[in-house]
């Protein structure tokens, strides 16, 4: 079996878990994300297509949505397939802990090698967290 490229990010947010959950799972409100030009929602919201500012389209299929706890989807485009898992939990002091794990399988072995240079998963995840904190009013 092919080995995925994997990246994990953990963040602690001052906002209530319900607020964080609603922001992350609401694909109709995406303007706060600097990495997305537009999102097209299809199949009654079970699927969506994200378009980057460069015009790259990635299709997502929501596979699990346990309110305030876990959000999962598979994803793919012409370059890769993969899956993403988001875990949400409330801390003792009322903050929200999020753990996002992304696993991608690059279709072409040569592109996989090059992807370490032009597709920095950790940087992409950190950009998302920074954008999320701004949306939540935490920065």
Where is each model-derived feature located?
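Hydrophobic ligand-binding cavity/cleft-lining segments
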Residues: 1-40
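Short, Lys/Arg-enriched, disordered terminal segments
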Residues: 1-6, 92, 134-139
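Short solvent-exposed loop/turn micro-motifs enriched in small/polar/acidic residues
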Residues: 4, 32, 41-43, 55, ...
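Residue-level marker for the onset of beta-strands and adjacent loop->beta junctions
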Residues: 7-9, 35, 44-47, 58-59, ...
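Hydrophobic pocket/interface hotspot
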Residues: 19-24, 29-30, 48, 62, ...
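Short, structured interface segments that constitute the first stable element of a domain
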Residues: 39-60, 127-129
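Hydrophobic-ligand binding "helix-grip"
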Residues: 53-99, 103-107
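A conserved amphipathic terminal alpha-helix motif
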Residues: 104-139
